[in-house]
Amino acid sequence: MIQQESRLRVADNSGAKELLCIRVLGGSKRRYGNIGDVIVATVKSATPGGVVKKGKVVKAVIVRSKQGVRRNDGSYISFDENAAVIIKDDKTPVGTRIFGPVARELRDNEFMKIVSLAPEVL
């Protein structure tokens, strides 16, 4: 469950290391985001020489969440950390690699490029 001021790790090689959530997109009263939701965030720390610089406002999709998500068969999946992948306006990732596992729910939200780049889909 991601809300305003939540900090997330970046799971790609765009150059950013940590994000701070500014807003969860999808309605004016929307407070919380989970796996597959798009957020607006700012880059809090970045690696030198990366594509994304510190302080830049970006869009990102949540790929891992400690809260977890319920599946249709009744099972739950949760992760050890909150992580996101920085995306462009056309829902393609800025980076060329994805680190760590991602949830299968991204496939339902038309993030097939992220799913195909991920080393493991749970």
From Swiss-Prot:
Q: Hey, which family's this protein in?
A: Belongs to the universal ribosomal protein uL14 family.
Q: What's in the keyword line of the UniProt record? A: Ribonucleoprotein, Ribosomal protein, RNA-binding, rRNA-binding
Q: Which GO terms describe its biological process?
A: translation
Q: What is this protein called?
A: Large ribosomal subunit protein uL14
- Please give the function described in this protein's UniProt entry: Binds to 23S rRNA. Forms part of two intersubunit bridges in the 70S ribosome.
- UniProt xrefs under Gene3D superfamilies: Ribosomal protein L14
Q: Spell out the GO cellular component terms annotated for this protein, sorted alphabetically and separated by semicolons.
A: cytosolic large ribosomal subunit
Top-rank taxon, per record: Bacteria
* Molecular function terms, GO-annotated: large ribosomal subunit rRNA binding; structural constituent of ribosome
Q: Which gene encodes it?
A: rplN
Q: Does the keyword Ribosomal protein apply?
A: yes
Subunit organization: Part of the 50S ribosomal subunit. Forms a cluster with proteins L3 and L19. In the 70S ribosome, L14 and L19 interact and together make contacts with the 16S rRNA in bridges B5 and B8.
* Keyword set includes Ribosomal protein: yes
Q: Name one Pfam family in it.
A: Ribosomal_L14
Q: Which species is the source of this protein?
A: Clostridioides difficile (strain 630) (Peptoclostridium difficile)
